[in-house]
Each structure stands twice: as C-alpha cells, then as structure tokens.
Amino acid sequence: AEHRIVPLYGLEIIALLPELQSAGVRINDPGNPGKLYICGKGITAFDPLSSRAGELLEEIRRKDSERMRRMLERMADLAAAAGIQVRLTEQDVKERIARRHGCPVEAVYLQERHLAQAYQEEIFARYKEADRAVALERFLGGPPASALDDAVGLQNEIRSRLMKAGKPAFVPETFVGFEHARALILAMGGIPCYPTLADGAAPICEFETPPEDLIGRIKDWNIHMVEFIPIRNEPDVLERYAVAMRRAGLVITAGTEHNTLDLLPLEPQCLRGQPVPECVKELFWEGACVVAAHQARRREGQSGFVDAEGEPNSDFPDAEARISAFAEMGARVIRNTVEQPLN
C-alpha cells in the first residue's frame, strides 16, 4: 500500500482428469489430454495456512520436489556425459533463487524453468564467452538455436530439448485431481478460476469449443471466474469468448505470461502485440476490481465473492448484481490505495 500498488494474490495448480485423459480430450493444455490448469484468485489465507490447506499443499509440494530431485540427477548425468563439470543439487538451485528474490531458502519450491535457468547460468559462469557455444552444443546434443546473448531463449531450449516428455532428463509428472485442486484454492480463501486457452491452441482444445459448451462445463464445475492470457489470442477470438462468458455471468480476468525472465509489457496485449479490444479491456478491469474486493473483504473477515465452499455470495439476487457490486467495491479499494500520498 505504501507504494500505491494493490497486489492481487493467486496461485496455479495442475490437476489431472483421468476420464478426459482416457477419452483424449484436451482441456487447456494443448499437448496433454486430461491435464487441467486451474487458478485461484484473491488468495487471503496463506499466512498462516490452515491445517487443511497445509495438508493439501504439502501433497503437491512433495510430489513436485521428488520429481525435481530426479530431474536434477538426470541433468547432472547429462552434463557429465558431455564433459561439462556442472552438477547442481536441489539446495544449490534453491539458494540461487533465494538470493535473487531475497527470500528464505525454505520458501523456494523448484519448477522446470528454475533448473533450466540454473544450468544456463552455471555454464556461462564456468566457460569463457568463446567456449560457450561448444559447451552448449555438447550439453544439448546439437547447436543451440538461440543467440548466446539470449539467456531466456537458451533456458527455454534447455527445458524443451532436455526436460520435456521424450527427452533425456524427463521425469513423468504426478498430479492431484480436480477436487483436490479446487479444495486447496478455497482453503486458501481464493476464487476458483478457469484459465481459458481458446485459440492459444491450434486447433482449439476439444473441451473449449464451442464457447457455449465451455461455459456450461465451467458452470458444471461450480466455477464463476475465468482468466485469459491474451498474448496468446487473436483479438476477435478473445472478444468472442470473453463477451459470451461475461453474458453468462462469469467474471473475466487477464494474465500477462510473466512466468519467465522475458521482458513483457505489464499491460495485456493480444498475439503479436495487437491491442486488446476495448470492450474486453473493460471486462478485465471489472474482473480485477472483483478480485480486489473479494480479497479486501475476506481479509477483514467479511463474505467474499464466493464462500468457503465456492458458492457465490448469496447476498445478491443474481450473478449480474453480484459482479456489479463487487466491481464497484473493488474499484474503491484500488482508488483509495493509488490515490493516497506516498510515504
């Protein structure tokens, strides 16, 4: 608040729906049938965690941590076989991240991109500029496609060429189910939110087309908020999906893909830098205000946009009244924060 910024806290969980996996139905991961990304918006109950949230989160962390340890072992073996004397441990990578972000080592949980970044940085630290291309070629099993001054591109190559399915450092993921993921979001005080890929996949995932059927499936899950990452979408497709969803009583939010070191704009853009349609911008702003209001009210012990079971706030006669009221409350929260004097 002292910097006049309203942080909206959230999390993302990967779940697996075996019945859709068996049927070959892609949900919102274009390469993996049955794999579901689900988000939680307006998280409030994370410090301290409730015992229920702690149990649900620990199961996910335990599975992830074991997978990362096994991948690090395979990465080290690949490096050794290539004659590259880099062997990073789980603790090594965690300490790097903790130093970078100024956080306790105990707060760090590794993901694939952390491992790829650590190996790229360590190879560059150990090899002179003239020798880096050869070292990377040995490590990757072929010349890098990215320029040597493109650190993020090289990290992405390490990940895609060594760590993905069918690659030498790959370790299969283990996932929780949908109900586990939804329960964790609610136990942390959040709003379950469906990330919509739409034309971010080609062809569009079976679960997500046509938009009217997707809306019905989201509502069947008792989810009342969706998210778009518009940098993946053509403006007309984004507008078609977002407007239909909002008319159906779903809150619309936006993400900006800031999950790597790529220097992307903070303001949402569509594919190839095209502007987000004005009507969708308004929906994104409305959604941000709803999340801000939910977060502020839950923090003060009041009812949020959804309750602890994920049911919509019953103080309002319908979705339109609920969304409008929370958007208005959230706009006040944001305005009161950004207009206060800087310390």
Model-flagged regions — what are they?
Residues 71-79, 146-152, 221, 252-267, ...:
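Short flexible/disordered coil segments
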Residues 1-104, 227-283, 287:
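A metal-dependent hydrolase metal-coordination microenvironment
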Residues 114, 224-227, 259-270, 326-342:
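Repeat-unit-sized solenoid/scaffold elements
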Residues 25, 36-40, 47, 134, ...:
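Hydrophobic transmembrane signal anchors and adjacent membrane-proximal interface regions, especially
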Residues 56-249, 333-334:
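Domain-core and long-helix interface of multi-subunit machines
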Residues 272-343:
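Extended, intrinsically disordered, low-complexity segments
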